[in-house]
């Protein structure tokens, strides 16, 4: 059995509702799949969404491995990525403990990803996003 190793990335998040504001987010993840960490997630997509007044973050990958520090993401966080080729969407993590009174996220906010969403939960979430953004993600 391999031991769990800590992997960390820092991502500058564009605020969904004010393009002039950014926040620095620290993401940590424990995994024993060390070999896969080096390259499996080079094309991961990290983005935020606000549902019912609560900000969430998720990571979409083509691997079941956690994000690692080889990922440098510069992305438009207002765009909903479409899952293709068996990609995974990681469990949504609520960021209320990272929010400031002005609505922005605290610098170095720490998030842990532990599991991916089930197919039924993912479908429900995608439908919510579709309704929220006025998109048909099933076409």
Swiss-Prot record:
Organism: Human respiratory syncytial virus B (strain 18537)
Subunit relationships: Monomer. Homomultimer. Heteromultimer with NS2. Interacts with the matrix protein M. Interacts with host ELOC and CUL2; this interaction allows NS1 to form an active E3 ligase with ELOC and CUL2. Interacts with host IRF3; this interaction leads to the disrupted association of IRF3 with CREBBP and thus reduced binding of IRF3 to the IFN-beta promoter. Interacts with host MAVS; this interaction prevents MAVS binding to RIGI and inhibits signaling pathway leading to interferon production. Interacts with host MAP1B/microtubule-associated protein 1B.
Name assigned to this protein: Non-structural protein 1
Localization of this protein: Host cytoplasm; Host mitochondrion; Host nucleus
GO CC annotation: host cell mitochondrion; host cell nucleus
Family (UniProt): Belongs to the pneumovirus non-structural protein 1 family.
Domain description: N-terminus is important for IKBKE/IKK-epsilon reduction. The DNLP motif has IFN suppressive functions like binding to host MAP1B.
GO annotation terms (biological process): symbiont-mediated perturbation of host apoptosis; symbiont-mediated suppression of host adaptive immune response; symbiont-mediated suppression of host cytoplasmic pattern recognition receptor signaling pathway via inhibition of IRF3 activity; symbiont-mediated suppression of host cytoplasmic pattern recognition receptor signaling pathway via inhibition of IRF7 activity; symbiont-mediated suppression of host cytoplasmic pattern recognition receptor signaling pathway via inhibition of MAVS activity; symbiont-mediated suppression of host cytoplasmic pattern recognition receptor signaling pathway via inhibition of RIG-I activity; symbiont-mediated suppression of host cytoplasmic pattern recognition receptor signaling pathway via inhibition of TBK1 activity; symbiont-mediated suppression of host JAK-STAT cascade via inhibition of STAT2 activity
UniProt KW keywords: Host cytoplasm, Host mitochondrion, Host nucleus, Host-virus interaction, Inhibition of host adaptive immune response by virus, Inhibition of host innate immune response by virus, Inhibition of host interferon signaling pathway by virus, Inhibition of host IRF3 by virus, Inhibition of host IRF7 by virus, Inhibition of host MAVS by virus, Inhibition of host RIG-I by virus, Inhibition of host RLR pathway by virus, Inhibition of host STAT2 by virus, Inhibition of host TBK1 by virus, Inhibition of host TLR pathway by virus, Interferon antiviral system evasion, Modulation of host cell apoptosis by virus, Viral immunoevasion
Short sequence motif DLNP: positions: 136-139
Coiled coil regions, renumbered to chain: none
Entry function: Plays a major role in antagonizing the type I IFN-mediated antiviral response by degrading or inhibiting multiple cellular factors required for either IFN induction or response pathways. Acts cooperatively with NS2 to repress activation and nuclear translocation of host IFN-regulatory factor IRF3. Also disrupts the association of IRF3 with CREBBP. Interacts with host mitochondrial-associated membrane (MAM) MAVS and prevents the interaction with RIGI. Interacts with TRIM25 to suppress TRIM25-mediated RIGI ubiquitination and thereby RIGI-MAVS interaction.
């Amino acid at each position: 059995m391999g031991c769990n190793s800590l992997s960390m990335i820092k991502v500058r998040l564009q605020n969904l509702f004010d393009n002039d504001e950014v926040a620095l987010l620290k993401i940590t993840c424990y995994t024993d799949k060390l070999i896969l960490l080096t390259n499996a997630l080079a094309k991961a997509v990290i983005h935020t969404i606000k549902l019912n007044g609560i900000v969430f973050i998720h990571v979409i990958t083509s691997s079941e491995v956690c994000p690692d520090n080889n990922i440098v993401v510069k992305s438009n966080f207002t765009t909903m990525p479409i899952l293709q080729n068996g990609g995974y969407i990681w469990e949504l993590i609520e960021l209320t403990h990272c929010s400031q009174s002005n609505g922005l996220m605290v610098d170095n906010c720490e998030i842990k990803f532990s599991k991916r969403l089930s197919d039924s939960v993912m479908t429900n979430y995608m439908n919510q996003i579709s309704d929220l953004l006025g998109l048909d993600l099933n076409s």
